[in-house]
Amino acid sequence: MSEPECVGRASDKEVLHRFGYAQQLLRDMGGFSNFAISFSIISILTGAVTLYGVGLNAGGPVVMGAGWPLVTFFVLFVAAAMAELASAIPTSGALYHWASFLGGPAWGWLTAWLNLIGLVAAIAGIDYGCAQFLTPLLGLPETPANFTVVFGVLLLSHAVLNHIGIRTVARLNDLSAWYHAAGVAIVVLALAFFAPKQPVAYLFTKTFTTVTEKPYWFAFLGGLLQAQWTYTGYDASAHTIEETKNARVSAPWGIYLSVAISGFFGYLMLAFVTLAVKDLGATSAAANPFIYIFEQGLGSTFGRVVLWIVTLAMWFCGLSCVTSTSRMIFAFARDRGMPLSARWAHVSKRWRTPAAAVWLAAALSFFLPCLILGLVALFPRRLDFSRLYPAVTGISTIGLYLSYGIPLLLKLRAIRRGVWTERANGPWNLGNWSVPVNVVAVIWIAFITVLFVLPPNELTGSVFAGTLVVLLAFYFLCVRGRFRGPVRQAKSQEDLLMLEQELDK
């Protein structure tokens, strides 16, 4: 616990040195850019749109009117608890480092892999969803082969941009934040002025479900996946903390505000979209209920415009997610936590980016949908493709939130044992509210983890349980005793400065 307790008023680089790491990545992101990367990954124009049908079919308009604010309320507790830890332990390893310092290398290793699985599944879900939107817009037949090719091109564009530097990506993330706000404004204003509207009570009283074998309240809870998956990836502000100026303050605000502002804009958009529903049965049966609402209310031309707006938002979202995932891979490999760690921890001297980690993130993300398509082809009678996209998003949600929850639970244990004190906190902290906020956050994470593996999400549960068994077996058979958690890159500050000078040559 000594590392988190010694940061004081030191500069960003001095703090990083005290954790034993050199300033290898270019620290050029401002506070807004740090916020923008998490805001872009949350991307209300991605998660809320691609899973709109899931929420609508599960519980109807009430899922939008009551479900979204319910999830937002509890996710704000999670974000605040994570922000506090980011301020205390400001390294790119983020969740993995927090868990390691608080619980030891075993907890850190498990957290790292859960976070990596969640992030890779998130990239796959985002970019494959984007490919499904973009393919018909390009006039191509909507076949799995075409989806996969377009998906690969999207991933390639994200990898190239992340390879060539954080400055380019930061500017695009800044643009993405304003683009999302403008996109929501266009959607809301168009519906407010030109589309027919249901009464406001429709959002809170109109129930609907296609889950006939379960009681309505159970179906409603299942519909929360729409909002909960949208609120993933905001740990990106922590993963890019070594590239952020005034990191111990800017990154925590980036985590918290990305959730709060997304919650406001997301609710505004979902409310107006849902109030524009004409025929609930026809809308729920549509291939894309979100776009169907626009086509019915404003015509096919505007529906196509909205489709382009959403598709570009997904592209921005995928770009930011590759950035976050590559930083997580870099930090974990830097501590020798992955196979071929030396390769994945490589930093490009020219661009000062974790280039190898960028391409690994893209490759793993491309592999996942290809694996799913292969399974569908092999077992067409047992696997329904329509259930696989929610399964991927469910895996992403559970993996990420378990990786969020482990360090928060370990922190509560450390506080109870007297190991973590106020002295360990960074400048952004919750004071006396820290314990209750962390308790609520952990309870919520436990609740959604159980919820999203119950029927009709048993496919998610099966895949995730199998993955967890493999991870634990691999740890106890191959890793235990060898992996020691965060590793100092050098013994002295002079050696760290020499590492930094090597990159400047």
Each language-model region and where it sits:
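Membrane-interface loop-to-helix entry segments
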Residues: 146-198, 203-204, 232, 254-260, ...
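Terminal cytosolic tails of multi-pass membrane transporters
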Residues: 1-29, 408-437, 456-505
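Helix-loop-helix junctions that connect adjacent transmembrane segments
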Residues: 64-65, 139-146, 175-304
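TM-loop-TM module centered on a large, flexible mid-protein loop between adjacent transmembrane helices
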Residues: 97, 104, 135-140, 210, ...
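Hydrophobic transmembrane alpha-helices that form the core helical bundles
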Residues: 49-57, 66-67, 76-155, 159-163, ...
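Helix-loop junctions at the membrane interface of multi-pass solute transporters
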Residues: 22-26, 53-54, 84, 96, ...
